[in-house]
């Protein structure tokens, strides 16, 4: 293993980029960049039946969108390739044969039914289910008999007895496993494909991976990988097992959990900002010193410290994500936010599919009204609902405001002035409201609240003159007329 920091993110193309996997990639990326090391992406694609056609490309595309840049992968071979497990058979096969020749592994011909029967018997006896070693010492005659029956063997690693496998985890501390609690495990499946724990240890060694940073659901895999390192006389990498991400019920974040969007692509489609997701995800199970919660990618690289990875589960707080994204939305120029919001306005049929320049200008004004409130670009649709409804239904508080004794006089003055107003723009509208104030003597909440309720149906909202401009003269006069 080299002295240089080399870490890897090893996704399977059986699915799209999940929040949990994105966090694994992020922490590996930040760790590598903090130590001026290499961030490697390796594709674990041996489960060909479950691989998605666009699974691999989607992973790369969404990582790039998040701002995660890799130093090595299928598109950047730095001499450690191939970077797809399916293309590394020439590396695995001699090592498999070596283990067979040294009697450190053996062929097992047991069927799935036989293995399940053994497992059930162990459970009935109150034992921990594990392979009992029935085919660990077959004679040549027995092997030939199984072959003649058409049985295809798997290959099992012969687990050493009375051995303790320990490692000092960067997050969890010292962790140990007793080999006597483990059965001989499969390193090559019946179809000839190496299993995860065998292949990953081989790959990490030959790619000179110095540190393995992953979720703590992989802790139980570690002793098997340590066995492979030990049996070949290789130095094991350092390990860091991150705490799991949990939902509001403090249950492990599951892809079947309908309460939380699970995939980066979903947030991307809604109009979340990549730098906001980068920021939010980095704070899932890791915390910087101090109270600040908004950092740039460059800041995170500078301050990232693996010692601050949390042992406790990371809570996925949807409200916190909305807040973080809103902080970034407020900093963006309106044109950027408008470009993100435009597809949502068109999809909701609030703008035509082929908008004119006038439509686009109106859309920009609409977005500028709500930019400081927006948690994500797609939120422009529910936020701006008041601009598009034909009928307004007032709540009790709104009805109380509009029933004020000063309202008829106020509405008469405002209606006549707005009807004659040209150009119908926010600055002129603001002047008009001030003129109404002077002429009627109505001021403060008595002035502004009835106007807002009359034109928007709401007690609160964006700047009133700007709102009136974006609503447009016809719609505003139509709504005011009810109270004249």
Swiss-Prot record:
Enzyme Commission (EC) number: 6.1.1.17
Cellular component terms (Gene Ontology): cytosol
Motif extent ('KMSKS' region): 252-256
GO MF assignments: ATP binding; glutamate-tRNA ligase activity; tRNA binding; zinc ion binding
Keyword Oxidoreductase recorded: no
Gene3D superfamilies: 1.10.10.350, HUPs
Reaction(s) the record says it catalyses: tRNA(Glu) + L-glutamate + ATP = L-glutamyl-tRNA(Glu) + AMP + diphosphate
Gene Ontology terms describing biological process: glutamyl-tRNA aminoacylation
Locations listed in the record: Cytoplasm
Matches recorded under PROSITE patterns: AA_TRNA_LIGASE_I
InterPro entries: aa-tRNA-synth_I_cd-bd, aa-tRNA-synth_I_codon-bd_sub2, aa-tRNA-synth_I_CS, aa_tRNA-synth_I_cd-bd_sf, Glu-tRNA-ligase_bac/mito, Glu/Gln-tRNA-synth, Glu/Gln-tRNA-synth_Ib_cat-dom, GluQ/Sye
Entry keywords, A to Z: Aminoacyl-tRNA synthetase, ATP-binding, Cytoplasm, Ligase, Nucleotide-binding, Protein biosynthesis
Keyword ATP-binding applies: yes
Residues that hold ATP according to the record: 255
Motif position, 'HIGH' region: 11-21
Major subcellular site: cytoplasm
Subunit field text: Monomer.
General function of this protein: Catalyzes the attachment of glutamate to tRNA(Glu) in a two-step reaction: glutamate is first activated by ATP to form Glu-AMP and then transferred to the acceptor end of tRNA(Glu).
Protein family (similarity comment): Belongs to the class-I aminoacyl-tRNA synthetase family. Glutamate--tRNA ligase type 1 subfamily.
Annotated PANTHER family: GLUTAMATE--TRNA LIGASE (PTHR43311), GLUTAMATE--TRNA LIGASE, MITOCHONDRIAL-RELATED (PTHR43311:SF2)
Full protein name: Glutamate--tRNA ligase
Organism the protein comes from: Staphylococcus saprophyticus subsp. saprophyticus (strain ATCC 15305 / DSM 20229 / NCIMB 8711 / NCTC 7292 / S-41)
